[in-house]
Amino acid sequence: MALRMPFNQAFWEEYLSGQDATLPSLPDTSTLTSRVIRILGGNPGAMHLQGTNTYLVGTGPSRILIDTGQGLPIWLSRIVGVLQSNNISISHILLTHWHGDHTGGVPDLISYNPTLAEHVYKNLPDLGQKPIEDGQIFAVEGATVRAVFTPGHSVDHMCFLLEEENALFTGDNVLGHGFSVAPDLGRYMESLELMAKLGCVIGYPAHGAVIDDLPSKLEEYIRHKEMRVQGILSVLVKERERVEGERGKEGRRKGGMTLHEIARAMFGTVPDEVIDQAMAPFLMQALWKLTEDGKVGFEPGDPVKRKWFAVARRKTRPSIRRQHGSVTSR
């Protein structure tokens, strides 16, 4: 059984509802290129944009399927229609990660074609699934798909690189509209950097329209997260400077702010329930990342009342080394 991290629906809704509400309409099924067909999951909403994108990949009679939607009957009807009208079948089912809007259609597909039970792949597989290794290749006629381990949005998240198109199926790491969320911000930002280094031009996201300029989108994502993290650090640095200024030379106290105080310093008057349900997940992950980076510390105790503080920068001193009985600096 795969290790799973908590999934905060309210946090998703806070992020996505704040983005452009006028999303472009997407067809239920679309032939995007000669080797990629997109089938919408039939589950539009604040969390899923126009719905979960699922993709049939390849050019021959046997295709790779990436993700399976939420498990709604309308999706099964759509994909069966595509399979039958094109006289094609599914060779592999590749799941980007464990969230139900990506894995929910697996049982329906197996009911439709029981032989598919032996061909379901996921990183950190659940019972009955086969593992996906970083760098593993899945190939059918017209398509070579390479798995790329990109955790952060979820502990098991995989992207898939389509070599023939220099395109990347980005899963939930990068969306077609707005920004995604990440319970593990540090690993997520590392994954974004890794995705950028792949050099893919096109992005096929799990939600939203095709990304025509993936490098620019990744740069935007990385900059957005860095600005959020830097904003939190700036608030804590100002608090430390305020405390030290008030206490003068005796200002040994670090200064500190609770999660709620940080949120209000950044966003103004915000109700406690909004902070707890919508802002706390990102703030906590950003604070832990800053802690891992050595820029922020905290006082042990009740997480709600815990004080976070900016770590003072240490003045660098010349390094000292001994040479032939003398002491030199450099």
UniProtKB/Swiss-Prot annotation:
Pfam families for this protein: Lactamase_B
EC nos: 3.1.-.-
Keywords: Hydrolase, Metal-binding, Zinc
Positions of the catalytic residues: 101
Highest taxon above the source species: Eukaryota
GO process terms (BP): secondary metabolite biosynthetic process
A GO molecular-function annotation: hydrolase activity
Cofactor note: Binds 2 Zn(2+) ions per subunit.
Pathway the protein takes part in: Secondary metabolite biosynthesis
Residues that coordinate or bind Zn(2+) 1: 97, 99
Binding site residues for Zn(2+) 2: 101-102
Cofactor(s) the record lists: Zn(2+)
UniProt entry tagged with the keyword Iron-sulfur: no
Entry-linked CDD domains: LACTB2-like_MBL-fold
Metal-binding is among the record's keywords: yes
Enzyme class, UniProt record, top EC level: hydrolase
Function: Lactamase-like protein; part of the gene cluster that mediates the biosynthesis of neosartoricin, a prenylated anthracenone that exhibits T-cell antiproliferative activity, suggestive of a physiological role as an immunosuppressive agent. The non-reducing polyketide synthase nscA probably synthesizes and cyclizes the decaketide backbone. The hydrolase nscB then mediates the product release through hydrolysis followed by spontaneous decarboxylation. The prenyltransferase nscD catalyzes the addition of the dimethylallyl group to the aromatic C5.
Family: Belongs to the metallo-beta-lactamase superfamily.
UniProt-recorded name of the protein: Lactamase-like protein nscB
UniProt lineage: Eukaryota, Fungi, Dikarya, Ascomycota, Pezizomycotina
